From Swiss-Prot:
Organism: Bacillus subtilis (strain 168)
Keyword 4Fe-4S: no
Keywords: NAD, Oxidoreductase, Stress response
Family: Belongs to the aldehyde dehydrogenase family.
Lineage of the organism: Bacteria, Bacillati, Bacillota, Bacilli, Bacillales
PANTHER family (alphabetical): BENZALDEHYDE DEHYDROGENASE YFMT
Residue positions of the active site: 253, 287
Protein name: Putative aldehyde dehydrogenase AldY
EC assignment: 1.2.1.3
Length: 485
């Protein structure tokens, strides 16, 4: 199926052209070819979408568990039936390899599968004992209302569905704005899937627009009860300021400076395998990506030798070639930012073990070794195929280095002693730590989220149910109650 025609906003069940008079070309990052051209929606259209979503939500909240499950099942079916075409569109739009794009679609479908398991949580009633004679206490779980959802360019379909599916499963409505660079895989394919599934008009509205048109409209509109955002910590702080003033809930997955620690008793070959994947999947453009490789001095030389040898063999180029491992960065701005980081590291005197190069819009891998944990490169979220290896004198120093960052999203540790690995993991101040694995892990039934400057809230069942619903206490006095006056 061709998805290039899905270049309009989806508002109130209709494909609606933007009224701004402005358009945005959606480009293939590898060759800059135009995939399609989107017309951008206005701030007024966004306001209308929130009004529509609010009205639609009141009816959707009355839907049955079976109704919601059926919609999710049909949306899943649409994605599965169009699997190959969707994978190719994700690759073309994001610059992600076929490997990455396949993983992304599989994760998206898994989110829908999991969402079907908790549609019955809505409307659940729990009776709680009362110390007042004749009183019955009931706690109801109700939809939260309208959700404002904003997703990034890197894993657009997965990170969009992570908010949209639970919202719909739990009786909410959604106004969703994908990054315009990945508007199709991050927005309109999802809208098409739910249109196919028979979701009532207005429950999901997908806005193709940009900040120039809508400003902070996704944040300041009084209708949404929760802002779900995945992106930079800087933007997350801005959202926090606005949401805090309005007492809105937030679900924020933000930046990361994720450590990958290799202890003295680690299987170095296994650690290298994990580090190669966890550093270079999607060219390093993932919030959970390995940002610092911290290696115990006893295995440091062996690790560096084996890691750099593997890096030099990674195939790069056109992301739609199934053999490619390292594809293009998303845009020129990201390339320039990466090159600036590289030049600064060179200026700082950090040893370059593998020197990559720019080939068109592809940046081949760079590996810096012997970096200080306080260096600029070690304290910067790289979002590029740049590896930084740091030597640790002891396990405790590795822990201290791992925690020496404002971020706390994901982390990993390699050791042959699993008990020691688990104890190490508990000392890392991050939302997620993986023993004998790399840092890029996700599943729809775990508590996904970060600590410190890496976010607020948790995705994954059952934690997401708490995020996207509200509880209400209703007490029923069944017999006359005596009052003190």
């Amino acid at each position: 199926m061709s998805f290039e025609t899905l270049n309009k906003s989806f508002i109130n069940g209709k494909w609606t052209g933007g009224e701004s008079g402005r358009t945005e070309d959606i480009l293939n990052p590898y060759d800059q070819s135009v995939i399609t051209t989107a017309s951008l929606a206005t701030g007024k259209q966004l306001e209308d979408a929130f009004d529509i979503a609010q009205k639609a939500q009141k009816e959707w909240a009355k839907s049955t568990t079976e109704d919601r499950k059926a919609v999710l099942q049909k949306a899943r079916g649409y994605l599965h039936e169009n699997r190959d075409d969707i994978i190719m569109m994700i690759a073309r739009e994001t610059g992600g390899t076929i490997i990455k794009s396949t993983i992304e679609l599989e994760q998206t479908i898994a989110i829908l599968d999991e969402a079907m398991t908790y549609t019955g949580e809505l409307g659940g009633v729990k009776e709680v004992p009362s110390d007042i004679e004749g009183k019955t206490n009931k706690i109801y779980r109700l939809p939260l209302g309208v959700i404002s959802s904003i997703s990034p360019f890197n894993f657009p379909m997965n990170l969009s569905m992570r908010s949209i599916a639970p919202a719909i499963a739990l009786g909410n409505s959604v106004v969703h704005k994908p990054d315009i660079q990945t508007a199709i895989s991050g927005g309109t394919i999802i809208a098409k899937a739910f249109e196919h599934a028979g979701l009532p008009a207005g429950v999901l509205n997908v806005m193709l627009t940009d900040v120039k048109e809508i400003g902070d409209g996704m944040l300041t509109n009084p209708i949404p009860r929760l802002i779900s955002f995945t992106g930079s910590t800087a933007v997350g702080r801005h959202i926090g300021e606005i949401a805090g003033r309005a007492f809105k809930r937030m679900a924020l997955e933000l930046g990361g400076n994720n450590p990958f620690a290799v202890l003295s008793d680690a299987d170095v070959d296994r650690a290298v395998d994990a580090a190669i994947f966890g550093k270079f999947i999607h060219q390093g453009q993932i919030c959970m990506i390995i940002n610092r490789i911290i290696v115990h001095q006893d295995v440091y030389d062996e690790f560096v030798e084996k890691f750099t040898a593997r890096v030099k063999q990674l195939p790069y180029g056109d992301q739609t070639d199934p053999k490619t491992v390292v594809g293009p960065l998303i845009n020129e701005r990201q390339i320039e930012k990466a090159l600036e980081i590289i030049e600064q590291a060179k200026t700082d005197g950090i040893e370059l073990a593998v020197e990559g190069k720019r080939v068109g819009n592809v940046l081949t891998p760079y590996v810096f070794v012997g970096a200080d944990n306080n260096s600029k490169i070690a304290q910067t979220e790289l979002f590029a195929p740049i590896a930084t290896i740091i030597k640790a004198g002891s396990d405790q120093e590795a822990i201290d280095m791992a925690n020496d960052t404002e971020y706390g999203l994901s982390s990993a540790v390699f050791t042959s002693d699993l008990e020691k690995g688990e104890k190490f993991a508990l000392q890392i101040d991050s939302g997620m730590t993986h023993v004998n694995d790399q840092s890029v892990n996700d599943s729809p039934n775990i508590a996904f989220g970060g600590n410190k400057a890496s976010g607020v809230g948790r995705f994954g069942n059952p934690w997401v149910v708490e995020e996207f619903t509200v509880t209400k206490w209703i007490s029923i006095q069944k017999q006359y109650r005596k009052y003190p006056f």
